[in-house]
């Protein structure tokens, strides 16, 4: 990372490890429940972790800053933009933001699945060119990574079904696994961001990836590696990046206050390449209570969730307009994300 920073690459590091660091530092006097353990270990471990990063980067003359966040901070546009502004100012002043979930006060029901989910949100929020997810294996395999016959899938195009390949095993101390990594990678790539899953245990992996595989994006990155055959999985980004607002909405499903159920015709139109809004005429049911600007899920005529959007009116107004012609959109196209 120091080499990339010196080459002019702006870096945001999303790092876990606070709980594990704290666990090795302190031994509770009595048995604690899971919530108390997480809060205690993360409080102690985060101080140890950020201090270690501070010392390591100081050896290279690089300042770092700590950013602790929670899932709720992505729920409203105001908090979302406030976080973005904080990290933008840090990057503009040569500071590497080191981001982690604030486990000391996060509510279990609203915690990130793991830091892969958090990294996807950060990459999307900051309009990153590349999201690199480092794991303990070389990428997405076409079988079990433990099977010698399995090979890494090097490129993943849009719409490719990977469900039969993904293993459910988790990394040590982590809350999520390869399924989470794949889901996040696909969503972020659909937003126009290059996503790479690679082995973080490989020496110089970051420099080699950017120098050998993405030279057009990072021409100033130099690598001394002789082996050009890197093994990793590359998620091909959508050719047209989505707007900043749509990126926020795309990751807001967990904060949805209600549901809009739409008919067969509306479902088909939304699945096309047309820029269309959700009109009352195509709505068959409005569930939940929400206000204007709240996030709502979009449910197709078969009951499948197909997207999320920002409501242009309250649930009461949506019910009054439901099924009628000539009414304003309940969700405008500019604030609609279809998966």
Please provide the spans of the model-predicted regions:
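C-terminal catalytic "cap/lid" subdomain
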Residues: 1-30, 35-63, 67-339
């Amino acid at each position: 990372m120091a080499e990339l920073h010196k080459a002019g690459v702006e870096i945001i590091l999303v790092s876990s490890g606070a709980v594990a660091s704290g666990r090795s530092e302190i031994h509770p006097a009595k048995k604690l429940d899971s919530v108390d353990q997480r809060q205690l270990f993360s409080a102690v471990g985060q101080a140890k972790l950020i201090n270690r990063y501070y010392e390591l980067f100081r050896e290279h003359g690089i300042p770092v800053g700590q950013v602790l966040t929670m899932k709720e901070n992505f729920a409203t546009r105001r908090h979302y933009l406030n976080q973005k502004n904080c990290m933008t100012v840090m990057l503009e002043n040569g500071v590497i933001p080191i981001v982690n979930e604030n486990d000391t006060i996060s509510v279990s029901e609203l915690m990130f699945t793991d830091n892969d989910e958090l990294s996807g949100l950060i990459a999307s929020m900051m309009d990153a060119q590349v999201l690199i997810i480092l794991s303990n294996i070389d990428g997405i395999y076409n079988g079990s990574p433990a099977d010698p016959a399995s090979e890494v899938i090097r490129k993943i195009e849009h719409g490719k079904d990977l469900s039969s390949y993904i293993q459910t095993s988790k990394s040590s101390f982590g809350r999520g696994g390869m399924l989470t990594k794949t889901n996040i990678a696909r969503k972020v790539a659909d937003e126009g961001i290059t996503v790479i899953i690679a082995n973080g245990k490989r020496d110089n992996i970051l420099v080699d990836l950017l120098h050998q595989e993405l030279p057009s994006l990072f021409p100033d990155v130099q690598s001394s590696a002789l082996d050009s055959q890197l093994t990793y999985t590359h998620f091909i980004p959508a050719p047209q990046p989505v707007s900043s607002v749509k990126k926020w909405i795309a990751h807001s499903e967990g904060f949805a206050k209600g549901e809009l159920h739409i008919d067969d015709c509306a479902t088909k139109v939304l699945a096309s390449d047309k820029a269309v809004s959700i009109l009352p005429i195509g709505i068959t049911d409005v569930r939940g209570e929400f206000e204007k600007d709240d996030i709502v899920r979009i449910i197709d005529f078969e009951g499948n969730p197909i997207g999320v959007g920002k409501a242009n009116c309250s649930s009461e107004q949506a019910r009054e307009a439901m099924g009628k012609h000539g009414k304003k959109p309940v969700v405008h196209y500019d604030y609609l994300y279809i998966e």
